[in-house]
Amino acid sequence: MRLTVVGANGRMGRELITAIQRRKDVELCAVLVRKGSSFVDKDASILIGSDFLGVRITDDPESAFSNTEGILDFSQPQASVLYANYAAQKSLIHIIGTTGFSKTEEAQIADFAKYTTIVKSGNMSLGVNLLANLVKRAAKALDDDFDIEIYEMHHANKVDSPSGTALLLGQAAAEGRNIMLKNVSVNGRSGHTGKREKGTIGFACSRGGTVIGDHSITFAGENERIVLSHIAQERSIFANGALKAALWAKNHENGLYSMLDVLGLNE
């Protein structure tokens, strides 16, 4: 399967290029970077410190998408919406690992998915998506006598909060209790907040160092707690998940899917 990596000079872009080179069922077709990048016209090998790859880096989306079957996208929300538009026009598979979308941007991507196959997830790893499945089941089994609190930590350069993964876990918990996350979420607490409101889902976030991603969700009841957690040790888990999603999407109809669909975990 021929694939284009966008945002290729970022952390995940480089991981995706590396992951593609390790496999025989996918091929690096093109590499896209931001306009005016110093990497333009150089070989993609410069991004991962490998031998010559024979793929020229470009800042032109038309060129990057002209001979590809799919787009691997861990970029920025505005850019992802633009790429989703290209994907819809050219019937390209679009794998989106970008986080931090506004409600308007989410709606735009959902609209583009009517015309192509899009897999979008706040986390592409098998472990996190299995965790989300367990969280949903636990939330369904435990009533609101068990308070739900989600904690996440990421590297110092992460710009959105809570993380896409934390929101994915929160959404799973809300679905388990048949409630709307936006109506019950509490993002951080500071000062005199008063008593915790029953039925809410709390989020706490930390940023520092080079942490790839730590997530835990606590169900706190009377005299007992259930804690489910996931620790990401390498970004390669997200890259491998994205490739799995691309190959899966190749055989599925137009629509907006998640990694839960890819992994057969969506109930």
From Swiss-Prot:
InterPro entries for this protein: DapB_C, DapB_N, DapB_N_CS, DHDPR_bac, NAD(P)-bd_dom_sf
Name the record gives this protein: 4-hydroxy-tetrahydrodipicolinate reductase
Family: Belongs to the DapB family.
Biological processes, Gene Ontology terms: diaminopimelate biosynthetic process; lysine biosynthetic process via diaminopimelate
Binding site for NAD(+): 7-12, 97-99, 121-124
Catalysis performed (reactions): (S)-2,3,4,5-tetrahydrodipicolinate + NAD(+) + H2O = (2S,4S)-4-hydroxy-2,3,4,5-tetrahydrodipicolinate + NADH + H(+); (S)-2,3,4,5-tetrahydrodipicolinate + NADP(+) + H2O = (2S,4S)-4-hydroxy-2,3,4,5-tetrahydrodipicolinate + NADPH + H(+)
Gene3D superfamilies per record: Dihydrodipicolinate Reductase, domain 2 (3.30.360.10), NAD(P)-binding Rossmann-like Domain (3.40.50.720)
Chain segments annotated as transmembrane: none
Pathway(s) served: Amino-acid biosynthesis; L-lysine biosynthesis via DAP pathway; (S)-tetrahydrodipicolinate from L-aspartate: step 4/4
Pfam families: DapB_C, DapB_N
Chain residues that bind (S)-2,3,4,5-tetrahydrodipicolinate: 155, 164-165
Organism: Bartonella henselae (strain ATCC 49882 / DSM 28221 / CCUG 30454 / Houston 1) (Rochalimaea henselae)
Taxonomic classification: Bacteria, Pseudomonadati, Pseudomonadota, Alphaproteobacteria, Hyphomicrobiales
UniProt key word Glycosyltransferase: no
Subcellular location as annotated: Cytoplasm
Binding site for NADP(+): 34
